[in-house]
Structure formats: C-alpha cells, structure tokens
Amino acid sequence: MRFAWTVLLLGPLQLCALVHCAPPAAGQQQPPREPPAAPGAWRQQIQWENNGQVFSLLSLGSQYQPQRRRDPGAAVPGAANASAQQPRTPILLIRDNRTAAARTRTAGSSGVTAGRPRPTARHWFQAGYSTSRAREAGASRAENQTAPGEVPALSNLRPPSRVDGMVGDDPYNPYKYSDDNPYYNYYDTYERPRPGGRYRPGYGTGYFQYGLPDLVADPYYIQASTYVQKMSMYNLRCAAEENCLASTAYRADVRDYDHRVLLRFPQRVKNQGTSDFLPSRPRYSWEWHSCHQHYHSMDEFSHYDLLDANTQRRVAEGHKASFCLEDTSCDYGYHRRFACTAHTQGLSPGCYDTYGADIDCQWIDITDVKPGNYILKVSVNPSYLVPESDYTNNVVRCDIRYTGHHAYASGCTISPY
C-alpha cells in the first residue's frame, strides 16, 4: 500500500522533468542570451551649499526628462532614432524663443539649410500664460519691427500701467492704503468700477488732480427747510465762541437766559467738477474747536447775508461759516473719500457736503430785524480762496417773508451775484 502511494506521487514529477530537460527540436532555435547590463555610473543630481559646506546628492537612477512638445518643422521620417540619441536638457524657460524668421523663409533659403541640423526649439511655459500669445509676443520681439501707431504686445501676467498716474493713486483700487486715514479712497464693494478705457469724472486724488472742482449750492434744499427758532444764550455758548451771533449778543449786559431769534436753514453743497475741493489752509494751520470737537480747515467756506428786498442793503450781519469739510453723501457710482477728521478734509467729485438746519452756526441772527420782505443770500467759497472751474454758480438767493414769528422762503435760485 505504501509503495502504491509513492508511485502515484513520483510519476508526475518524473514526467515534468522529462518535458523541461528534453533537447529542442531541429527546427527550433533558442535566442542568444544577452550579457547583463553594466551598472549605471554614479551621476550627480543635486548640489547645494550651506554654511560654507558643499553637499551633493548622488543617485544611480535615470535622469528625469519632463514632457515637451516636438517641433512640427523638425518631424522628419527616419529621424526618430537620431532624436532619441540626442541628450535632453530640463526645460527651465517660461516663453517660446522661436523667432518668426523661420516662418517667413523663402523656398530657396529653406533648401540650402535643409542639410544642416536645426536647433531644437525650447518651449517655455508658466501657469496662466497663453501659448498663442507667447508665440505672437516672441515673433514681434524677433522681428523687432513695430508700426508707429501700434502698441507692442504685453504679457497677460501684469496689466499695463498708466504713465500719467502714480502708484496707488487710483481711488477705485481696493488695495490702496494711506497712513493718514484708513477710509481714504474707500472702495465700495457694492459698486464695482465700470470697465472701460476712459476714467469717470470722479477720478482724482490729493496727489493727482484732473481739472478743477466746481461747487454748487442746492437752492431747493434751502427753500424746503427754512424756519425761525428762539434759543437762550445759555445754549448758544459754543456758537458765541465761533462768532456765530450778531454783535448785540456780545454786549456786557447780555445774560444767559436772554433769547436770540435765529433764521435757520440747511445747506447742501455739491462738487460737480472733476477734481477734489481741498481746504485752502495747510493741515498744520487747522484750528481745533474744543466746544464742537472738530477741526476747522477753512476761514470762510460759506457766507450768509440777509438783504432788504427793496434797497438790497444788508439788514443782518453776515456770518462767516468755517466748516469741517467732508463727503456726507455721494451720487450713485461715486464713493466717499473724505471725513471730518484731522487728516482728511475735502469734497470729492460727485459728493455733497450737507449741513442740517439744526446744527450750530447754520443760521442768521435776526434778533434785531423787523418783520418784512427780505432776500437770503448764501455764498459758497465767497473769497475764491480755492480755484474752481466756474464761479457763477456759487450763490443762492431766496425770497424771505418774515412775520416776526415765522419765516417763509420761496423762489430760491442760483444767481451769479
């Protein structure tokens, strides 16, 4: 029984040995064996220097060859083996250095140079760079010929810069930074700048002026909210410090509970020019008013007069109003860039400097004025301290009917005088 199991196990093994060890047939030829390849030589891959010591990283592996395009003009039948034997170098460029001269060769010149090996074109690439634009830019640089009115091709990696502007001078640039005020050139995210080659009329900052400002007072704003109010001298102490009352309010016999009659009216001035309206006084000479807690940047921004309707004679002393200039509001598409601070004061193009009728010094003291018909004259930039493109729209005249207790304004218009 044990012998039978041994025969069954050794039988297949002997059969396999006979099959593998049998000599090949006469018609079959065994391919010759190639000698083993010699081990690759050590090649230097990376070398660097640190603290005066040179380090090298050696490897037996093959050198990495990045993928590159084959020049269409160099594709010649039968040249595959020759090109495979040529050493390849890593691609380290970012543009295509092929010139346009190869494209404009004549048939004769191409025939002469057919036997010469053409240099392999190196293709330079970078993320975000267009290959077609790179070829066009390379061709224009190689030809070195540009039409008189033609602008050379520019890379799309960097937009063209303006020559007449300064760096960071665009008021619509969201990354513009100013050490004076973080809200200077404030960029409104809800109002994107319109694309186009021309700048909008609001372009202009303190560094780069585009034309001149043009102040215009709103006559309808004055007419809508003119009224009479009585206030005690106790509540007018801050206004008295800024000389906002009539001369009779500064007499020695005036007491705190005495009342003054005030003709109140609002004012809204718009800069419809193409440049910023900046204060006439330099920043170091601005006056700080502790009572109102702000700086006055102009000696006389507005002037108020009450004239007799028949004789045009002044019946109430005019008031010099030196305000804190700022962009209270702006038209759609324009942005606030000035605030009533110690650093930035002014009026941007397309913006308004608004003063309500309830603030201090926005009035004329009419305590000594009798009832009758008068003319309210409001002048903006009356002394022409700041240059403007048009001075004929700086005055507003309104007809005032004063009853002794109430005042009614009508017929407010812009006047040249």
From Swiss-Prot:
Chief location category: secreted
Signal peptide: 1-21
Reactions it catalyzes: L-lysyl-[protein] + O2 + H2O = (S)-2-amino-6-oxohexanoyl-[protein] + H2O2 + NH4(+)
GO biological processes: ascending aorta development; blood vessel morphogenesis; bone mineralization; cell chemotaxis; cellular response to chemokine; collagen fibril organization; connective tissue development; descending aorta development
One annotated GO molecular function: molecular adaptor activity
Post-translational modification: The lysine tyrosylquinone cross-link (LTQ) is generated by condensation of the epsilon-amino group of a lysine with a topaquinone produced by oxidation of tyrosine.
Site (described: Cleavage): D218, P219
One GO location term (cellular component): extracellular space
Glycosylated residues (UniProt): N81, N97, N144
Disulphide bond pairs: C238-C244, C291-C340, C324-C330, C351-C361, C398-C412
Effect of S348R: In AAT10; 21% decrease of lysyl oxidase activity
Residues with 2',4',5'-topaquinone modification: Y355
Binding-site residues, Cu cation: H292, H294, H296
PROSITE patterns assigned to the protein according to its UniProt record, in alphabetical order: LYSYL_OXIDASE
PANTHER family: LYSYL OXIDASE-LIKE-RELATED, PROTEIN-LYSINE 6-OXIDASE
Family assignment from sequence similarity: Belongs to the lysyl oxidase family.
Disease listed for this protein: Aortic aneurysm, familial thoracic 10: A form of thoracic aortic aneurysm, a disease characterized by permanent dilation of the thoracic aorta usually due to degenerative changes in the aortic wall. It is primarily associated with a characteristic histologic appearance known as 'medial necrosis' or 'Erdheim cystic medial necrosis' in which there is degeneration and fragmentation of elastic fibers, loss of smooth muscle cells, and an accumulation of basophilic ground substance.
Protein name, per record: Protein-lysine 6-oxidase
Species this protein is from: Homo sapiens (Human)
Encoding gene per record: LOX
